[in-house]
A protein has these predicted regions:
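Structural alpha-beta junctions
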Residues: 89-90, 294-299, 365-366, 518-519
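Protease-associated
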Residues: 253, 260-346, 355, 359
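N-terminal catalytic cores of NTP/NDP-binding nucleotidyl/phosphoryl-transfer enzymes
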Residues: 47-110, 172, 240-248, 255, ...
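Histidine-rich, glycine-flanked metal-binding segment
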Residues: 22-53, 294-297
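Hydrophobic, aliphatic-enriched repeat segments that assemble into extended interaction scaffolds
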Residues: 96-98, 263, 491-494
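Residue-level signal for beta-strand positions within conserved beta-sheet cores that form or flank
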Residues: 53, 215, 328
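Residue patterns forming the tRNA-binding/recognition surfaces of aminoacyl-tRNA synthetases
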Residues: 2-18, 22-25, 31, 35-39, ...
Length: 521
């Protein structure tokens, strides 16, 4: 047996470098970063890049509200790779980092500190609260900036920007002023996604969808013979289905589909425990009648007549809580959004709690009742439910309907439902006066955005279709928030008429004040 141990190192062609065998990054990375700083590598790159074509990476800034997490780090590292690659490809990759310092995430953190200390936010002057938000954001900008530098992200960290810097606040006010002067900024009453926990409207980007179990109800709306003039429909009720029983107090109408077939069903017998009544007559979409009977415990029935939806439009029903403080009627209107996918083929319309409800109500001059306050509780003037929170209202509303004899059935549905990305609480649609920017009209923001999307390269290419679809369908942009920490909408409004003041000189004075003293000026 040969014990000789051959050394083959000299026979293998390997590169020779000064790199150590071990990375020892914990020890060596700080040295490397210190050497970059000592050389002022960023300034050196800028000097060597003079005259090159610029490459600007438009970076959505992070929130200054805590240590970096893996998502923030990955986002910034990938962008750093892009910038470095373009720099080495012959461009001047000028990257100026920044932070989003306004808005709910930071305000929510300050409120959490208040709650932990038993402080009442409402007792704190707004300017003092804003100062605390500013100090909090300033602190975390410093922390995050050091963490980004520790990751090796190259950028002009000495000249960073922040949305709370006075020049930034002035620029935001100036842009809002342009929309005001052009007429694109307007104040309107409209249902928006509302967070009862944060007491504010939320943007689409602030909304998450999670599975949620909702209470559902089938409710009968009795046709009012005195208002209808249809003897053949005496004693007939329209059946509706909703996943938001708490919106019943805000009902002002019913929608039907013009081309949908509706069965006038005579109930012959019901199962034990059903709230349906033998002998009653209900109007339900013909295609949904079997599902309706199964869900409501109707054992047998027969169809007396089939109507088209257009024949039912114009009928008037009583509110299901009539006699209990709800004496308003519920007329039936055609709605192009009504389908036979689920429910009864009729849609209960609460103009203050849904986009389609609101639009139909506006088209027919319906009032928009103010039933729910900013904190999600029914207002004092709402019969039966004043002071009750909408999250807890399903049971009491169903009990009131049952006592009134208008509840047909109840159930539960697990479905995807909007939640606040910050509080994780369910949201509601709530009609409130808000400030909007028109997507259409003379400014043609939608058209300009779609044209820009068409001219932009997307990787992957399907991103263009997705973004264009979102822009095509989005309603006017709600820019107002009912919060303290942000750039205020700088509009003076005539107290009696509500008409905004559109004066370029006034707007210029506001912008100058913001530039000098910030939004607290």
């Amino acid at each position: 047996m040969n014990d000789r141990r051959d050394d083959y190192r000299d026979t293998v062609f390997l590169p020779v470098t000064s790199f150590p065998m071990r990375g020892e990054l914990r020890r060596l990375e700080p040295r490397l970063l210190a050497r970059w700083a000592e050389r002022d590598l960023w300034a050196e790159l800028r000097r060597k890049s003079r005259g090159r074509p610029l490459f600007i990476l438009h970076d959505g800034p992070p929130y200054a509200n805590g240590h970096l997490h893996i998502g923030t780090a990955l986002n910034k590292i990938l962008k750093d790779v892009v910038n470095r690659a373009r720099q080495m490809a012959g461009f001047d990759a000028l990257y100026i980092p920044g932070w989003d310092c306004h808005g709910l995430p930071i305000e929510w953190r300050i409120e959490e500190e208040y709650r932990a200390k038993g402080r009442d936010k409402d007792a704190v002057p707004v300017v003092a609260f804003r100062a605390e938000c500013r100090a909090y954001a300033e602190k975390w900008m410093g922390v995050q900036g050091e963490e980004f530098r520790r990751l090796g992200v190259a950028g002009d960290w000495a000249d960073r920007y922040a949305t709370m810097d006075f020049p930034s606040e002035a620029a935001i006010a100036a842009e809002i002023g342009k929309f005001l002067l052009s007429g694109a900024l307007y104040r309107g009453l409209r249902p928006v996604m509302w967070s009862p926990v944060e007491k504010t409207a939320l943007a689409e980007a602030e909304i998450e969808y999670h599975d949620h179990t909702s209470e559902t109800v089938f409710v009968r709306f009795a046709i009012d013979p005195a208002r209808t003039g249809r003897a053949d429909l005496s004693g007939v009720s329209v059946a509706i289905w909703t996943t938001t029983p708490w919106t019943i107090p805000g009902n002002r109408a019913i929608a039907c589909g013009a081309g949908i077939d509706y069965a006038l069903a005579h109930i012959d017998s019901v199962e034990l425990g059903s709230l349906a009544r033998p002998g009653e007559k209900l109007l339900v979409a013909l295609a949904l009648l079997p599902e309706f009977c199964a869900a409501t415990g109707i054992a047998t029935h027969h169809v007396e007549h089939v109507f088209k939806g257009e024949e039912l439009a114009g009928l008037v029903c009583r509110h299901p809580l009539a006699g209990h403080g709800y004496e308003q009627s519920a007329p039936i209107f055609e709605g192009d959004f009504v389908t036979t996918e689920q429910g009864t083929g009729f849609v209960h319309i609460a103009p203050g709690h849904g986009e389609e409800d609101f639009a139909l109500g506006q088209a027919h001059g319906l009032e928009v009742p103010d039933t729910v306050g900013p904190d999600g509780t029914f207002n004092a003037w709402v019969p039966l439910f004043a002071g009750l929170h909408v999250y807890k209202a399903a049971g009491p509303v169903m009990k009131a309907l049952e006592d009134a004899g208008t509840l047909i059935a109840r159930g539960r549905l697990v479905h995807s439902y909007p939640h606040s990305w910050r509080s994780k609480a369910p949201l509601i649609f709530r009609a409130t006066p808000q400030w909007f920017i028109r997507m259409d009209g003379p400014e043609n923001i939608r058209g300009k955005a779609l044209a820009a999307i068409a001219e932009t390269g997307f990787v992957p290419a399907r991103g263009r279709t997705r973004l264009a679809s979102m822009v095509e369908q989005r309603p006017d942009w709600c820019v107002s928030r009912q919060r303290a920490w942000g750039v205020p909408i700088t509009v003076f409004v005539e107290r009696r008429s509500g008409e905004p003041l559109r004066d370029p000189a006034v707007m210029a004075r506001i912008v100058a004040a913001f530039a000098a003293e910030g939004a607290d000026a």
